[in-house]
Amino acid sequence: MTTHATLLPSCYEESDYSTLNLSLTTDISNCSSFWDTSIKTEKIIAYQDPTYYSLNYRIIGTIFQGVIFLVGVLGNIMVVIVVTKTRSMLTPTNCYLVSLSLADLLVLMASVPNEILSYYLLGDEWIWGRAGCIIFIFLQYLGINASSLSITAFTVERYIAICHPMKAQMVCTVNRAKKIIIGVWVFACLYCSPWLFLTKTVPIYYKGHENMETCTFALSREHYLGYFFADLVIFYIFPLLLSCVLYGLIARILFTNSLGEDYGKRNGVKTSDWKKTNNNSARVQVVKMLAVVVAVFATLWMPYRVLLVYNSLAKERYMELWFLMFCKTMIFINSAINPILYNAMSVKFRRAFKKALSCGRTRQETGLVPFRSVAITTRENVAQKTTEA
């Protein structure tokens, strides 16, 4: 589940496992012969001709990924602000969405600027040193894995809230959600901690340039296969399978309730409590939005996942530059699109975004309250909060 977008030279792309770190337009055979002479013999240094991305590649990559970065950063920051500053928005589900936004922010901040910068550097040049190599790799993995865990967490929370409403009054609370989110990030940090030791910087040699280095894997490709496939299963396949099962069960409950209401209306039975219908409608809206988030996650990560599996099994790896840019861009879109989905599919988020963006209004008019008062809630509205987004 890797997307450290600009960190590995193309010679390591060919010999190592990751496929999203291509930052060189030169021929692979030249690269392999270069490393054979400069590293294996340690006596003969073969200097390569300077290589750069094409102008079209730079322009397209900069424009598309730059726009995605700006939209994603601003959108995810808005999600965090409206949930933490608006009393009615502080629900267990929205707490998980805040966690997802923070993870997406981490992915965008640790990946996109370096990706765009790499278009204008020489070859595989890495300018942030060994510490930067370690930190950026770790943060990218941390953000990716935390986002997957956050998606899994809010899926389970919705299942409990809708399919086990009595249990939800005790389980689906804001305080419990905060504890689960802390656990998610602690687990993600521990799982990603090996990357603090699995990367390094090595010197690279170009004619007319000195003291250059690149960021790459510290071990050979074979040592990473198990780790990468564990990522694939734990943070992609398992969350998607679990989501399919749980959303199927949720849909059955909501569909059954909807049929019951239609039957009552056809037979002249009036609903005694109109709030029940309102709550069910709100639940359907929330579930639709979250299901779309999961579907988008699965779709946008699929090109990279397919490429990862193919390149790990095929004798000749597929390393076409434009397709690699496409895979990376899809991952960046995945980290930027969720706030747009919330605005499009959730009336409450749409209203909260408008209020947060409005100018010249008082705190009472916009519905914003100090953060410290957000956590103050009553037991009577816990059950209602579990049905809202």
PLM features: what roles do these ranges have?
Residues 57-66, 92-99, 103-153, 161-164, ...:
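Extracellular TM2-ECL1-early TM3 structural module of rhodopsin-like
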Residues 57-85:
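First transmembrane helix
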Residues 1-52, 208, 256-287, 347-389:
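Intrinsically disordered regulatory tails of 7TM GPCRs
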Residues 143-153, 160, 164-213, 238-255:
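Fourth transmembrane helix
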Residues 299-308, 325-373:
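Seventh transmembrane helix
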Residues 65-68, 106-123, 137, 144-151, ...:
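Helix-to-loop junction signature of class
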Residues 44-51, 121-137, 142, 170, ...:
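Loop architecture of class A 7-transmembrane GPCRs
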Residues 49-63, 88-91, 124-131, 138, ...:
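Juxtamembrane loop-transmembrane helix junctions in multi-pass integral membrane proteins
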